[in-house]
């Protein structure tokens, strides 16, 4: 009779181990999905910050274009804030999944030990990217913002800088005597059709990647 009870107890433990293990696998699958979304958003954030750096460099190199570039910077700052907010939400989601996974694993390990089985490996041992420590290390990079270089503090200083830039250009032998200031080179985004800087790799308004409107066409063969 005692043997039957022991066998039934072990069968119940095996059943519970199976159910809890299936639940653990589902959580791990969700963790992987969350991390893929987190990695994708992290990549976008790096692109946004690279675009921000380009805009800041452009602002200092062409003082006369400050107003247009400042508008782009404001849009990009809002985009970065939204991206960081999304990343923080994903990080909180991964924390909750870790909190849900940990007691399940401890319970399964205890049951496995009653059957003489080894403990299951920790998440960090199975896959480094699924560990909570990995996400915490990345957070410091996500919150790093590019430092804006100093700019003229008044419109008078900006105007003086623009005049100096014009004078330097007029001294260049390649410039004609009838030189006049040209507007900043712009192009239309093919996705949202808004005017953006010609060299911008990403539209700051709709986030679409820029591409040429006039790609090279293959040469037509002469008619036989």
UniProtKB/Swiss-Prot annotation:
Zinc finger (C4H2-type): 189-206
GO MF: zinc ion binding
Pfam families: zf-C4H2 (PF10146)
InterPro entries, sorted: ZF_C4H2 (IPR044069), Znf-C4H2 (IPR018482)
Name of protein: Zinc finger C4H2 domain-containing protein
GO CC, any one term: nucleus
Annotated function: Plays a role in GABAergic and V2 interneurons differentiation. Involved in motoneuron development and in neuromuscular junction formation.
Annotated knockout phenotype: Larva with TALEN-induced zc4h2 null mutations show abnormally pectoral flexed fins, outward positioning of eyes, continuous swimming movements and balance problems at 5 days post-fertilization (dpf). Also exhibited an open mouth as well as continuous jaw movements. Display a reduction in the number of V2 interneuron precursors in the hindbrain and spinal cord at 24 hours post-fertilization (hpf). Display a reduction in the number of GABAergic interneurons in the midbrain tegmentum at 35 hpf.
Region (Disordered): 166-185, 204-224
Ranges in coiled-coil conformation: 12-97
Subcellular location: Nucleus; Cytoplasm; Postsynaptic cell membrane
